[in-house]
């Protein structure tokens, strides 16, 4: 027997504030069981407008984070004329089966859509809501093409093998924290949120120079999933089965709203889905796909905040995303007007000017690509106060620049122990290079200049080891010396020519390294500011450490360590340069 009860959604405070308009109620159905094709039953909690009389569209969130955590969203949409279903994925919460991240949500999502569509309280139209993993769920469900899926609105959608569990084939220590969060059937929220514990364990692995594959043992949660992921260090068939193929993108026909942020940790994933649909989709389908890029971090793609990691944005950044979702669902499933905010198919926020701008497509932005060449005086670019230069002047025959990465150097760990609430403005790393890095600055901007889109960095480099990792970052350095992080990229040297085929480096050979995986950003760079390019080899407790031996990186330890001596060239025949998209 299913239990029913009525939830009084609005608080007494709201009731007193607006006594002329009684708070709407919703009806909740606890413990609905959704059958899947293999006999497993998923758990759902259903929220419906009180005393619903007519069938309505259904919105559902498919989550490994326990459906109850989305109560506020469910009641919001139920108060506004929708049935809302919070569905625990297979093996999580009160759902049956075993949870294997990213593996089953596509087929299971299809079955959920079709079951919801057949219920008497549904009018046959089903939509999805959610971000991060629940954004991934939307894309993997869509690739199965359930007939009654009317629209998806993926926010900060993770993309397997693009931004999680690795980025450009470099694993993050965070993955074991996330796997612990989603271990078993409960929420594990307090364990997940104990940052002190996780930093201590990541530091333990780092200080002892243990192989990355031992991380699950070090934290006390040995999982087969962690080891399985490490066995697939590139985007192979295992990962590719989880996301839409090029052929799938050609078949998409429903409206889509993609939401991400300048500082969304899953921006690479969200934009990969979007860009591949723009590349392979039909013209009619692309015309129904809208994109919003706000000045937000990961959580801000669902609940925007003015302050993000040391940056403060204007009130214009605070889009009411609940209301925007409602308008989108009204438009796509009820024949309502197009959402007010969506003035064109691409909406992006220009930080530094605090305005929203619109375009028909990313290509329609038509930026002027400004090429800035790297140079230095006397081969010295290894200090923030004695940096190299970025300029439009063609390179001359100058001495190359050099830096060194010793994977046994543990000094950076001491700088990474505290939580940093100002991560986007912090300059600790550029002030503490420890010989590991090169820095290049432009001249001061003579006028405020909008830079919007993707940058590209090309470096000609040689080294004396068969492999290492590179990290590149671009910042705005203001006239007062403070800085703002703009975008970043990472590369494992063995994958310099292909993310799926490794090719170890021949020591001493000069190779071209093209960094083209930077995140999208938009900023009005202030008059008097400079741009700073920072190149280094990552040496962080938060990342899989490359010990430079050329072996499988997850298996390397301090015993395999080799110091990398890296040379960057910027002469006429080997011009290293940065390309930035300037809006005229």
Predicted regions and their residues:
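N-terminal cap/lid segment of alpha/beta-hydrolase-fold proteins
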Residues: 21-54, 441-447
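Cap/lid segment of the alpha/beta-hydrolase catalytic domain
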Residues: 49-118, 165, 302-313, 434, ...
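Accessory cap/linker subdomain of secreted extracellular hydrolases
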Residues: 79, 143-251
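Catalytic cores of eukaryotic secretory-pathway lumenal/extracellular enzymes that build
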Residues: 86, 95, 138, 146-154, ...
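Alpha/beta-hydrolase fold nucleophile elbow
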Residues: 120-133
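C-terminal, loop-rich substrate-recognition/catalytic regions characterized by aromatic stacking residues
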Residues: 206-213, 307-584
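Short beta-strand/loop motif that positions the catalytic acidic residue
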Residues: 252, 258-260
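Active-site-adjacent alpha-helix of alpha/beta-hydrolase-fold enzymes
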Residues: 268-289
